[in-house]
Amino acid sequence: MKYQGSCHCGSIKFVAEGELSEVLSCNCSICQKKGSLLWFLSSKQVKISLETSENLANYTFNKHVINHHFCKMCGIHPYAQGTDAKGNAIFAINVRCIDDMDLEKIKINYFDGRSA
């Protein structure tokens, strides 16, 4: 199934394709503060479109292996990019940014990112 979403102001939009049955809630320092619910997909399953690249900002911390992208205009974090354990490019879509998402229907798995 295809899902569309964006930041709050619409400057950063995405289309993600896959089966969305469960997401990850992480308690690491950044996820805890952002409140993201993450859906992990391969880079082939996600298409990003930008109103202008000037509105896309990136934040990295700790080991600097995950690019946490956010909108400079509205401050929303719609997705992050990185690599999985096998070196494949992946996206972590914040499902809270998907249009008309009913979070009640999705299983939430909790991950102890503070201890990882």
Which functions belong to the PLM regions below?
Residues 1-6, 11-116:
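A short Gly-Trp-Pro
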